[in-house]
Amino acid sequence: MIQFLVAAPCSGSGKTTLTCALLAALKRQGQDPCSFKSGPDYIDPMFHRAVLGVESHNLDLFFSAPETVRALYAQAAAGHGAAVCEGAMGFYDGLGGVSDTASAWHLADTLGLPVLLVVQPRGASLTLAAQINGLKQFRTPSHLAGILLNDCAPHLYALLAPMLERETGLTVLGYLPHLPDAALESRHLGLKTAGEIADLQQKISRMADALVMDWEKLFALTEGAAPLVHTDRLPPAGELPPQGAEEQRPRVPIAVARDAAFCFTYAETLEALERAGAELCWFSPLQDSALPEQIGGLYLPGGYPELYAGQLSANRSMLASVRRAVERGLPTVAECGGFLYLGQSLEDANGERWPMAGVLPGQGFRVGRLVRFGYAALTAHADSMLFRAGERLPVHEFHHWDSTDNGTGFTAAKPNGKQWDCGFANEHFYAGFPHLYWAGTALPRRFVDAAAHYHQEEQDQ
């Protein structure tokens, strides 16, 4: 099985572009690749999914223990001919930017993956070799196995490749030339989402066409035994229903928002909910007039509601449907953008304020910079639908908007010690800015149990 991780010295080097080009080329060759993303990012996996037509998975060593990450990787890679993981940020950049914990290197070390280093030869030549050697020597083993040059002219590649191999001892495997017609646009949370780029498939095809690669060398460096799937670890124990429970009750319908405004979901979270007994019912707060009928729960994930605030506000029937359902006690989870949607109002990118569902007291407003960005540990103050008092869960925040009332149900603490209160929770509700990673936790089981109880009560009336 072909397995490798794509990394770079820093963000903006072209990891996503190279990863998409490699995935598309491997798919053309019939390798049936699957893909992964290190860290908590939602957007890059959307591009992987656009290339492959199947889900991409996040692997995060802050969210999950090493054995859980290995199990998730093995499960998702099973049956595929190639597994390609895209690293996050710089190769060694982990918690708080001052640790290699949860970095791309940490993931490569945990999974034993060879690493292909993406380098952009902008204004440097021999100095690139010095930088690469520094990365090689910084940790042992570095797992660096090969070099890919991005945004590189053919004549420059012919000059740099033999020099880099001589000076670093690494194999230079290929390059992607300058492709202005295939550039992926960005905005405040990173790249625009895959669904917003109308000609994305043409761009992906252009990348794959232009990719120059020594495939024989790549396969020699990256081919190895497929990871073993440890069935006793999949799904993690916290997600397992009681023995025979699946036969005792039918699947519980849970409405999940999915459209341009609500698109930040982890594949592992959705899979964990399904393993816990949920039937996922997709709906669009932008387009649909009401929630799906006869549901037992509601999941409002993050996304970009601030970019669609006017359209969301204009869909009054959906806002009323959500408000009635939550006030009736429908088990509900709302993360980040979903949390803003449940507030009183939301300011859009132009500064105009729009009425929202009105379930929560806060008003969402634009800050213009990242707010409380990064990893944190969430500690519950009291028992609720998802949490038990004193329970801690690793979470992530990534937003340029804030609320006038973030709640006080939890304490969030960053690795650097900074703390703040946040979140709303009761016996049928969770809402807050933190993004939750559900795989390997008790959350899926608790949410589905609450949804099943509510669904049964509704049917009995």
Model-derived segments and their meaning:
Residues 113, 170, 327-331:
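A short helix->loop->beta-strand "cap" motif at the edges of active sites that frequently abuts
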Residues 250-316, 320-327:
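Phosphate-binding active sites in nucleotide-utilizing proteins
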Residues 125-246:
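Internal gly/pro-rich beta-alpha loop/helix module
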Residues 5, 84-86, 116-118, 148, ...:
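Structural motif
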Residues 305-384:
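Cysteine-nucleophile active-site neighborhood
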Residues 2-111, 119-146, 151-158:
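ATP-dependent carboxylate-amine ligase catalytic core
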Residues 37-38, 172-180, 279-287:
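Beta-strand->loop->alpha-helix junctions that form or flank phosphate-binding loops
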Residues 108, 262-274, 279-281, 366, ...:
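C-terminal and late-domain segments of enzyme folds
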